A protein has these predicted regions:
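Alpha-helical transmembrane segments, especially those used as permease/efflux helices
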Residues: 1-97, 101-109, 414-429
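Conserved transmembrane alpha-helices of multi-pass membrane proteins
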Residues: 5-21, 316, 364, 373-374, ...
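Short helix-loop junctions at transmembrane helix boundaries
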Residues: 23-40, 378-418, 428-440
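Peri-transmembrane interface segments
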Residues: 36-44, 117, 288-327, 339-341, ...
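Juxtamembrane segments of multi-pass membrane proteins
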Residues: 52-198, 202-203, 210-211, 222, ...
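Hydrophobic alpha-helical transmembrane segments of multi-pass inner-membrane transport and secretion
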Residues: 86-111, 311-348, 358, 369-383, ...
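Basic-flanked hydrophobic alpha-helices used for secretion and membrane insertion
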Residues: 148, 158-300, 307
Length: 450
């Protein structure tokens, strides 16, 4: 028909229009320097993929038709009906594709961040008890007193400064403390394990957080200069460490160096490693030394509270994902109502030829589910691309830290189930509307025949 030919030309034009968008996205990808640049690339990729969707649906539907034998005439009829539904469902399916892609990409980003944060906390908070910096006699507590429950301790010190126009923190650490020894460095010089703790090397080796690398634009092995009491000191960066959630530049130096070169050095609290089974004994000892229970916290409590805060923070993301899916479902419902209202006279012809309502439902449901399936399958690799961009590009440009991408099929399966429920609900509403209006269409068909 003329309508089908026009729609076929439109699909071909959309496919060809996607090619320059893909090419432009590829060209801009290698020039991403800001968050805006990253979102421009994402927009180009998503819209280009959406333009390819109608042709993809047509291709898959044609393959299904070619594989069905002529004896399965009902299935062939149902598959052919997709060509009648696609012109008016095209925009709604493109919106559904973008919704599913965003849902998969953002969910993967959040899960990757949570996994990275949890693993980082396992090492960063490896001590059993953390005493607040406000405790008056913290210096005496840091000294090993021969207690049988104490395995190790780590008293961090710190001083606030500025580096390249932004707030920075220089922390003094005990290089032999368990959390420093076990600290994972995503990037380091080959000989960084010992030299960074040396006091005799000039320039002094130093560790920096990833924000220094990605936001401060400093490479491994380069020299940075930090000011103290009007004097500039040079340090060579021998490694970068993860530092999730902080907006500051952070540097690690041995505690002796920090105390020698900076004034007003403050305590950053005390970490205590306790022998297995002796946690209660350790807490009782702290109470006997005049430290109230509110002035220290257990490792497990810190981790639990940290992850609870994380989960509450990103609950809004899950709510927005659900909202966008509902909006896409409403758009699909509106498109379905429009297409089936327009085809009521055609359905009246089917009914007069002996097609039952159940057969009608199968004939119109099969192509819709097929089109939604193609949309969902295309959303999976597109969602992976989105999550890859968010994790390895936008996250680094915006916050300055890196993390591995953690892909899980469980959220994808859950999203697929919810999508099927939304589509079936829309189909059910449309079926009720058609069933209610079909008798009127039959009467009109009978009147035309008189």
């Amino acid at each position: 028909s003329l309508m089908w030919q026009q729609d076929e030309r439109a699909r071909v034009m959309m496919m060809w229009s996607s090619l320059p968008l893909f090419a432009l996205a590829l060209a801009c990808f290698y020039r991403i320097e800001t968050v805006v640049d990253g979102f421009v690339v994402l927009t180009l990729i998503l819209f280009a993929a959406a333009l390819v969707l109608p042709v993809s649906i047509q291709f898959v539907n044609s393959m299904v038709l070619n594989r069905l034998s002529r004896r399965n005439w009902k299935l062939r009829w149902a598959a052919s009906d997709a060509f009648a539904q696609l012109p008016q469902l095209r925009v709604a399916l493109m919106a559904l594709l973008l919704t599913l892609t965003a849902n998969i990409g953002v969910t993967t980003l959040v899960n990757s961040f949570r996994d990275a944060l949890s693993n980082w906390l396992e090492i960063r908070l490896s001590a059993d008890i953390y005493i607040q910096r406000t405790v008056g006699n913290i210096d005496t507590l840091a000294v090993t007193d021969g207690s049988e429950w104490r395995i190790a301790s780590h008293q961090r010190t710190g001083v606030s400064t500025r580096w390249r126009g932004r707030p920075a923190i220089v922390q003094g650490v005990d290089v032999s403390a368990p959390d420093i020894v076990d600290m994972q460095l995503p990037e380091q010089l080959s000989d960084a394990s010992v030299p960074w703790a040396s006091l005799s090397v000039d320039p002094q080796p130093i560790l920096a957080n990833e924000q220094v690398k990605h936001l401060g634009q400093v490479a491994l092995g380069e020299t940075v200069r930090l000011e103290s009491a009007g004097q500039q000191y040079s340090y060579v960066i021998v490694g970068f460490f993860h530092d999730y959630g902080t907006p500051y530049y952070r540097f690690y130096l041995p505690s002796d160096v920090v105390k020698q070169r900076w004034q007003n050095v403050r305590s950053e609290g005390l970490a205590l490693w306790v022998a297995p089974g002796m946690l209660e004994m350790a807490e009782q000892t702290l109470i006997e030394k005049g430290i109230d229970p509110g002035e220290w916290i257990r490792q497990a409590d810190i981790k639990r509270v940290s992850l609870e805060i994380f989960d509450r923070t990103f609950q809004i993301t899950a709510a927005l994902n659900s909202l966008t899916l509902v909006v896409a479902g409403v758009a699909l419902l509106a498109a379905l109502l429009a297409v089936h209202q327009q085809r009521l006279p055609e359905y009246a012809h089917w009914y007069s030829l002996g097609v039952t309502f159940q057969e009608w439902f199968k004939l119109v449901a099969f192509p819709l589910l097929l089109m939604v399936m193609v949309t969902g399958l295309l959303a999976i690799p597109l969602g992976w691309v989105l999550s890859w961009m968010l994790v390895y590009k936008l996250n680094v440009v915006a916050f300055g830290w890196t993390m591995p991408l953690v892909w899980s099929w469980m959220p994808v399966m859950q999203l697929a189930m919810v999508t099927v429920m939304v589509v079936i609900s829309a189909l059910a509403i449309v079926a009720l509307q058609v069933r209610r209006r079909l008798p009127v269409a039959l009467k009109q068909l009978g009147g035309m025949g008189l």
